[in-house]
Amino acid sequence: MNASATQATEIWPLVAYFFLVVMLVVGVMALSYIIGERHRSKATDEPFESGIVTVGLARFRLSAKFYLIAVFFVIFDVEAVFLFAWAVAFRELGWPGYIEAIIFISILGAALAYLWRLGALDWGPPRHSAGRFAKDSRSPNHAVVSK
């Protein structure tokens, strides 16, 4: 038996599986088209909100800080993955691996310190000098802008 015949006998289950998956997808989509309802009404293009009547538009602005936090999460999540892989292979990597991990952590720490210093992590209102805001007698945490 030659090499191409051996390869063909080894790959036929994969080809058969692929063919069956494609046939199943086509069959389900055809069945959905045949059985499904075809009516157009005003409510057809509206999203279903569990029986609650929609009010207003769904489009509203989100602060860019939400996206910034998502980016921070991704960065430090990837850092955790790299450090976990480093910890698993710690004995094989030796001192060079340890030094590389320290450099990696230092670069990410410097980036975090830079962003913190830049104010990228401040969620509250901007801090002002004490002369511009005066304490109000109504609440200890309530400030009124003096004119």
UniProtKB/Swiss-Prot annotation:
Report a single Gene Ontology molecular function.
quinone binding
Spell out the Pfam families in the cross-references. Answer: Oxidored_q4 (PF00507)
Q: Which UniProt keywords apply?
A: Cell inner membrane, Cell membrane, Membrane, NAD, Quinone, Translocase, Transmembrane, Transmembrane helix, Transport, Ubiquinone
Give compartment(s). Cell inner membrane
- Topology class, membrane: Multi-pass membrane protein
Chemical reaction(s) catalysed? a quinone + NADH + 5 H(+)(in) = a quinol + NAD(+) + 4 H(+)(out)
Q: Which GO terms describe its cellular component?
A: NADH dehydrogenase complex; plasma membrane
Q: What class of enzyme is it?
A: translocase
Quaternary structure, from the entry: NDH-1 is composed of 14 different subunits. Subunits NuoA, H, J, K, L, M, N constitute the membrane sector of the complex.
| Function, in words | NDH-1 shuttles electrons from NADH, via FMN and iron-sulfur (Fe-S) centers, to quinones in the respiratory chain. The immediate electron acceptor for the enzyme in this species is believed to be ubiquinone. Couples the redox reaction to proton translocation (for every two electrons transferred, four hydrogen ions are translocated across the cytoplasmic membrane), and thus conserves the redox energy in a proton gradient.
* Protein family per UniProt: Belongs to the complex I subunit 3 family.
Q: What is this protein called?
A: NADH-quinone oxidoreductase subunit A
Gene name per UniProt: nuoA
